[in-house]
Design a protein with these regions (language model features):
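Primarily recognizes the serine-hydrolase "nucleophile elbow" in alpha/beta-hydrolase
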Residues: 142-146, 152-198
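Short alpha-helix in the alpha/beta-hydrolase fold that links the catalytic acid
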Residues: 213, 222, 236-245
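Post-His helix in hydrolase/transferase enzymes
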Residues: 265-279
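Catalytic histidine neighborhood in serine/cysteine hydrolases
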Residues: 241-264
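Membrane-embedded segments
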Residues: 45-142
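An N-terminal hydrophobic leader/cap segment in hydrolases
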Residues: 1-44, 56-69
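Acidic catalytic loop of the alpha/beta-hydrolase fold
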Residues: 231-235, 262-263
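Short beta-strand/loop motif that positions the catalytic acidic residue
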Residues: 219-221, 226-228, 232
């Protein structure tokens, strides 16, 4: 009888890890955010499926836009773009993801956010680890080829499992400006073993979706910021500490007091916007050749 649950986990693990939601609960231009955006379609190499996404340009100097009070805004001295890799429990229309996009824009970034295949507007079925890596590469190609964004102007931002995807992409592109991993884990095996009811199974033997960030992070060659809520009950913050310890300089770690897995905003000095501001300064020091520019970000 013990073999049946193991067989179930082996065969159905992709359906347990990825939870595609087709319906977008919010749009960027809904009143709560009022974000200007362009619908984009991203081609996946060697696939007929396309990824649906939103290009959200940085605010212009003349634009009045919604801001979080007492937080930094328009911090950039040269154009920069955030390539936002969401988690896999929701799609890009989730309130918390769009709140994050709005905060990025307040800081002066343009943002490309998209859904993995099978999610939201994107075509295709349940993805796999290899396929979400391919999807992130397709989004990178879109920024480089279609938007003509220089690689050093791209900050890759990954949230939860999206952090593992972002890390893989950043390793393949050491020319990127930097990497931010938020609420992410050391490996899928350890993330699953954190769930007590699954500890009875030989997860390491059954799991094919590895997402082994702890092994990979040693190969990273771009500046990195790890952010994690101290009250995260989904992925313990000590996993970000271990990733930080394994990573090479330049690196930063920001543990947000009382923040959970998704709702990470805390006002004042504990604000993740201020952490991103400090990281952006680190990125600029690491890439001093970037020309100063009064524009907020790439159009």
């Amino acid at each position: 009888m013990e073999k049946l649950p193991c067989l179930f986990l082996l065969l159905r693990q992709r359906h347990l890890i990825y939870r595609p939601a087709a319906e977008l609960s919010l749009q960027p231009d809904d009143a709560v955010f009022n974000l200007p955006h362009e619908d984009v379609w991203i081609s996946i190499p060697n696939s007929q499926a396309r990824l649906g996404g939103w290009w959200i340009p940085a605010p212009t100097q003349q634009e009045n836009f919604i801001v979080l009070p007492s937080e930094p805004s328009n911090i950039l001295t040269s154009p920069k773009v955030i390539l936002y890799l969401c988690g896999v429990g929701r799609n890009m229309g989730d309130y918390n993801y769009l709140a994050r996009v709005s905060a990025f824009r307040q800081l002066g970034f343009s943002v490309l956010v998209f859904d993995y295949r099978g999610y939201g507007l994107s075509e295709g079925d349940f993805p796999s680890e290899l396929q979400v890596y391919q999807d992130s590469q397709a989004a990178w190609n879109y920024l480089r080829d279609m938007r003509q964004i220089p690689p050093e102007q791209i900050i890759i931002y990954g949230e939860s499992l999206g952090g593992a995807i972002a890390l893989d992409l950043a390793i393949r592109h050491p020319e990127a400006g930097g990497l931010i991993m938020q609420s992410s884990f050391t490996s899928m095996t350890e993330a699953i073993q954190h769930r007590r009811f699954l500890q009875i199974f030989p997860v390491g033997l059954l799991l094919t979706e590895k997402f082994d960030s702890l092994s990979k992070v040693r190969s990273l060659r771009v500046p990195i910021l790890f952010m994690h809520g101290s009250a995260d009950s989904v992925v313990p913050s000590e996993m970000s500490q271990r990733l930080y310890d394994a990573a090479s300089e330049p690196k930063q770690l920001f543990i947000i007091p009382d923040a959970d897995h998704v709702k990470i905003y805390q006002p004042g000095e504990q604000s993740y916007l201020k952490a991103i501001q400090r990281f952006t300064e680190l990125v600029q020091q690491h890439n001093p050749g970037q020309p100063p520019n009064n524009s907020s970000a790439a159009d």
